[in-house]
């Protein structure tokens, strides 16, 4: 048995109490279906009560729908069973009934119906301890002066109004109620939908519908309930066999009579319905002179009459087919719209008028067929106006919708263009990625072009082998005048060598700003003069130690201090432009020449 959700149950309630039903009536078959759903417990009683209450609260502004909703509640109360009655008699629903009786002023019929229902519930359950809230609401309304129909005949047999059979509550047990077998993993338990007992598979394998419980699908029942229903069907069928034999003859006759009556009613309805707009016109030549003089007009009129007769014959055949197929109602076009026959009359009248322009007025006035056609066309003028207005309204609506669609499309295109523009801007201004080796960039761009001459000479000396370094004389620190001259020499070299202008990793050798010969001459002369002055001032007499021991210790201590920091490196200078190779060779060869000159001066 399939269950029903609250949404589906609410839809069925709306169909039963539709606003299209006049005078507060309801759809009775759908209402009985709702009561069967409640009685068979396909929906929980509380959920069913809340769906009905929701429909009542949502239709307070419509008296007809409100009346039909309360009528549906009355049917459900009398056919829903005891579990549903308990929810109706609860405080949640009784407060709604009390509020309707006291404060609903739109319809006296609704107030009277709700008052009668409350009084019936009070008479039926005034002695029930579980449903005593009905008595409290009744006493409260009596104190406020509400009048109840106490003298009505409903009080004599009110308990029979709520006597409806419902499925029994399920009983729990550990053994079958017929064979007493214990339930286990293999021997599963099953409940009977009729009596609510617990049975094994062997004694609950049958399934039948239970219409007296509101269950029209085949459900599982036990063997005892199946035998009871089978016996009831057998006893009922034996008593009806004799009556069935006697009434079988009359059944066929009744069917024939009903069919005959239905055909007669359909024929009457078709005759009373709207006749075709163009009736049959008798083709009696009243004015033979006009017909002889105008054969084209005569042929056109005869053709229109033949078409009208064929149209009438086709409609009669169609009506007969509908009657044989048990469709008594015929399709009727709207009264305020043009029919195809009206359109044909208008076109025919227009063509005839165009042809009659050359005829004298007397012939036009004497033609009775043309006069009848003119009357039909003039009678269809209001319908033509209504049709024209409806078409104009539809056209304006479509034009408005087209304008809205175009506006929406333009707005959507602008949004897309803005998004694409934002994406292009974000891609254009992305942050470049950092290089993998930061020291390479530092060595290329952040180092000065040329260091001072002391660092250059030290690098040249350090690159020599150890034996050659020991044979060369040691030098002392330069004086102030020598430092000034070295700084001036550094400025000259910086002016000669320009820093890189563009940030590229490629190093392109460029031509020096001056010819190589002049640059070689200048650098060789300056180096010779400076080193000659150094050796003359710092000449050491024979027999003396060139360097004190303390100075060696100090150099070692300073050298160890510098090496304490691992990252304290003196990176070699990478010039931005290629230096002439002759200068380097001259710098490396000059110390030997200066030594020879110093020895010659001493001699």
Swiss-Prot record:
Gene Ontology cellular component list: endosome membrane; ESCRT-0 complex; vacuolar membrane
MF GO annotations: K48-linked polyubiquitin modification-dependent protein binding; K63-linked polyubiquitin modification-dependent protein binding; phosphatidylinositol-3-phosphate binding; protein domain specific binding; protein heterodimerization activity; ubiquitin binding; zinc ion binding
Biased amino acid composition, Basic and acidic residues: 307-319
Segments for region (Disordered): 233-257, 307-340, 452-483, 496-519, 536-603
Binding site for Zn(2+) 1: 176, 179, 200, 203
VHS domain span: 18-149
Any GO BP annotation: protein retention in Golgi apparatus
ZnF (FYVE-type) residues: 170-230
Annotated Zn(2+) 2 binding sites: 192, 195, 222, 225
Keyword Protein biosynthesis on entry: no
Oligomer status and interactors: Component of the ESCRT-0 complex composed of HSE1 and VPS27.
Role noted for this protein: Component of the ESCRT-0 complex which is the sorting receptor for ubiquitinated cargo proteins at the multivesicular body (MVB) and recruits ESCRT-I to the MVB outer membrane.
Name of the protein in its database record: Vacuolar protein sorting-associated protein 27
Native source species: Candida glabrata (strain ATCC 2001 / BCRC 20586 / JCM 3761 / NBRC 0622 / NRRL Y-65 / CBS 138) (Yeast)
Phylogenetic lineage: Eukaryota, Fungi, Dikarya, Ascomycota, Saccharomycotina
Recorded name of the encoding gene: VPS27
């Amino acid at each position: 048995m399939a269950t029903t959700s609250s949404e589906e149950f609410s839809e069925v309630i709306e169909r039963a109490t539709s606003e299209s039903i006049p005078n507060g009536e309801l759809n009775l078959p759908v209402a009985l279906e709702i009561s069967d759903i409640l009685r068979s417990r396909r929906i929980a009683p509380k959920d069913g009560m809340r769906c009905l209450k929701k429909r009542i609260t949502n239709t307070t502004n419509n008296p007809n729908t409100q009346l039909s909703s309360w009528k549906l509640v009355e049917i459900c109360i009398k056919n829903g069973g005891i579990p549903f009655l308990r929810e109706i008699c609860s405080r949640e629903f009784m407060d709604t009934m009390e509020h309707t009786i006291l404060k609903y002023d739109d319809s006296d019929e609704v107030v009277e119906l709700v008052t009668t229902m409350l009084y019936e519930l009070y008479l039926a359950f005034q002695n029930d301890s579980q449903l005593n809230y009905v008595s409290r609401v009744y006493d409260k309304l009596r104190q406020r002066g509400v009048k109840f129909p106490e003298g009505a005949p409903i009080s004599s047999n009110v308990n029979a109004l709520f006597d409806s059979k419902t499925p029994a509550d399920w009983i729990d047990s550990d053994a079958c109620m017929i064979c007493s077998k214990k339930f286990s993993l293999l021997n599963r338990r099953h409940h009977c939908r009729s009596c609510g007992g617990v049975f094994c598979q062997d004694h609950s394998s049958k399934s039948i519908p239970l219409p007296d419980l509101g269950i029209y699908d085949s459900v599982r029942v036990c063997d005892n309930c199946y035998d009871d229903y089978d016996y009831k069907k057998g006893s009922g069928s034996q008593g009806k066999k004799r009556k069935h034999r006697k009434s079988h003859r009359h059944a066929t006759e009744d069917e024939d009579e009903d069919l005959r009556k239905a055909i007669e009613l359909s024929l009457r309805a078709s005759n009373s319905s709207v006749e075709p707009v163009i009736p049959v016109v008798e083709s009696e030549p009243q004015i033979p002179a006009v017909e002889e003089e105008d054969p084209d007009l005569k042929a056109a009129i005869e053709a229109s009459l033949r078409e009208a007769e064929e149209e009438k014959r086709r409609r009669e055949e169609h009506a007969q087919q509908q009657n044989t197929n048990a469709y008594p109602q015929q399709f009727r076009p709207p009264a305020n719209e043009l029919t195809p026959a009206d359109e044909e009359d208008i076109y025919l009248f227009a063509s005839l008028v165009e042809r009659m322009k050359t005829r004298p007025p007397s012939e036009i006035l004497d033609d009775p067929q043309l006069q009848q056609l003119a009357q039909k066309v003039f009678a269809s003028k209001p319908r033509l106006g209504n049709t024209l207005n409806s078409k104009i309204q539809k056209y304006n609506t479509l034009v408005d919708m087209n304008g809205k669609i175009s506006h929406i499309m333009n707005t959507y295109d602008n949004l897309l263009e803005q998004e694409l523009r934002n994406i292009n801007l974000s891609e254009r201004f992305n942050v470049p990625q950092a290089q993998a080796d930061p020291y390479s960039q530092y060595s290329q761009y952040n180092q000065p072009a040329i260091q001072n001459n002391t660092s250059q000479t030290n690098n040249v000396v350090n690159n020599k082998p150890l034996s050659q370094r020991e044979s060369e004389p040691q030098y002392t620190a330069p004086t102030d005048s020598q430092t000034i001259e070295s700084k001036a020499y550094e400025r000259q070299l910086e002016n000669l060598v320009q820093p890189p202008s563009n940030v590229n990793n490629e190093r392109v050798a460029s031509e020096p700003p001056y010819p190589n010969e002049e640059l070689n001459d200048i650098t060789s002369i300056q180096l010779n003069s400076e080193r000659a002055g150094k050796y003359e001032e710092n000449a050491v007499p024979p027999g003396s130690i060139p360097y004190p021991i303390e100075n060696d210790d100090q150099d070692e201590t300073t050298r160890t201090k510098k090496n304490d920091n691992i990252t304290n490196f003196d990176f070699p200078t990478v010039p931005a432009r290629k230096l002439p190779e002759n200068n380097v060779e001259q710098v490396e060869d000059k110390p030997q020449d200066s030594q020879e000159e110093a020895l010659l001066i001493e001699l």
